[in-house]
Swiss-Prot record:
It is found in: Cytoplasm. The gene is pgk. This is Phosphoglycerate kinase. It catalyses: (2R)-3-phosphoglycerate + ATP = (2R)-3-phospho-glyceroyl phosphate + ADP. One of its GO terms (biological process) is glycolytic process. It is an enzyme of class 2 (transferase). Pathway: Carbohydrate degradation; glycolysis; pyruvate from D-glyceraldehyde 3-phosphate: step 2/5.
Length: 397
């Protein structure tokens, strides 16, 4: 699969419509975490360097096709200006029609224009061809730098890419390269770590992975469901007992595909779910009836350590235990730090994604050591599920 990048495009003197993700958290009208804004800077600066005029398109929140003042991208303007010091950043109060048309016409080389929330128009989420055509009128080239919105076929992600010469921005390019290295044409053996609470939310993911990876590590609450499927009692632990048949199907599918599934060998149990709760480590088959499993134990960590050490590629989505609360973060921390260490030593390509995963790796102090950490959430999951992402498919040449 190939796609054009900024290196393939002649941008001199052209208005470049750039789909970005600036859907940042806000409190009292202030941006509390500008990470997503900072990530688009390389693309914007590259376009400026090539003599293009970047016009930014983005959504913000879920206004459902209506104008909602608290979801205006005007609120993001100060943080965007701060991320681009020395560059004039202007704002237009719509993303189609006379206002942005006039603002684009008035742009000088070296300036950036931010357009209003695309989701203020009901046609955005319906991928309305008329809205996409009205957006396309504003520029000569389209660049998608929002991998996080690539799983949605919207006017500004998919419709627009069909109407103008299109390329991937630097963030999108980095994401696609990392994902291609991890699951497209990976170096083997490939290990996937999948954690989290529920099997039901990750059925497609598990089903796709067993056919594509050599080892599948299952952790978190969903491991309990697999234990139940094998006739093991898990006390008061979180488990989806109605998913036991499905778990057994996944186990047999894995066996047929030659994928080894790793479940906890020992577990850390407690009677209450709170920081510093009295806890003990027991064999997986010996969970007391009045206790709940909150983490994988040291035997499990040691066994996984051997699996990781023999791997060449690792993909991670979801923690191995209740990482938010000490001491039930021990297995996740130990595994994350080892993966980071192997990656730094050049022995492993490691790609991680999903909100909880990123939080867990940051908490463990291991995030910096991974080859690539995706901030994309839903798009990362759908990519891991083997689904086509409309925003990426539209860029494919």
């Amino acid at each position: 699969m190939g796609w054009k990048t900024l290196d393939d495009m002649d941008l001199a003197g052209k208005v470049v419509l750039v789909r970005v993700d600036v859907n940042v958290p806000m409190e009292n009208g202030e941006v509390t975490d500008a990470t997503r804004i900072e990530k688009i800077v390389p693309t914007v600066e590259d376009i400026l360097k090539k003599g293009g005029k970047p016009v930014l398109l983005a959504h913000f929140g879920r206004p459902k096709g209506k104008v909602v003042d608290e979801m205006s991208l005007r609120l993001v303007l100060p943080a965007l200006q701060k991320a681009l010091p020395g560059t004039k950043v202007s704002f237009a109060a719509d993303c189609v029609g006379p206002e942005p048309e006039q603002a684009v016409a008035a742009m000088l080389e070296g300036e950036v224009l931010l357009l209003e929330n695309t989701r203020f128009h009901a046609g955005e989420e319906k991928n309305d061809p008329e809205l996409a055509a009205a957006m396309a009128k504003l520029g000569q080239v389209y660049v998608n730098d929002a991998f996080s919105a690539a799983h949605r076929a919207h006017a500004s992600t998919e419709g627009l890419a069909r109407l103008l010469p299109s390329a991937a921005g630097r963030l999108m390019e980095a994401e696609l390269k990392a994902l291609e290295a991890a699951l497209g044409h990976p170096e083997r053996p490939v290990v996937a770590v999948v954690g989290g609470a529920k099997v039901s939310t990750k059925l497609d993911l598990l089903g796709n992975l067993v056919g594509r990876v050599d080892h599948l590590v299952i952790g978190g609450g969903m491991a309990n469901t697999f234990l139940v499927a094998q006739g093991i009692e898990v006390g008061k632990s979180l488990a989806e007992r109605d998913m036991a048949d499905t778990a057994r199907e996944i186990l047999s599918k894995a066996k047929a595909a030659g994928c080894t599934i790793h479940l906890p060998l020992d577990v850390v149990v407690a009677r209450e779910f709170k920081a510093g709760a009295a806890n003990e480590t027991v064999e997986t088959s010996a969970c007391p009836a009045d206790a709940m499993i909150l983490d994988a134990g040291p035997k499990t960590v040691a066994a996984l350590s051997e699996v990781f050490a023999s791997a060449k590629t690792l993909i991670w989505n979801g923690p191995l235990g209740a990482f938010e609360i000490e001491p039930f973060d021990a297995a996740t921390n130990a595994a994350a730090l080892q993966v980071a260490q192997l990656t730094k030593a050049g022995q492993l390509i490691s790609v991680a994604g999903g909100g909880d995963t990123v939080a867990a790796l940051n908490k463990a102090g291991a995030a910096e050591g991974f080859s690539y950490i995706s901030t994309a959430g839903g798009a990362f999951l759908e990519w891991m599920e083997g689904k086509e992402l409309p925003g990426v498919a539209a860029l494919t040449v």
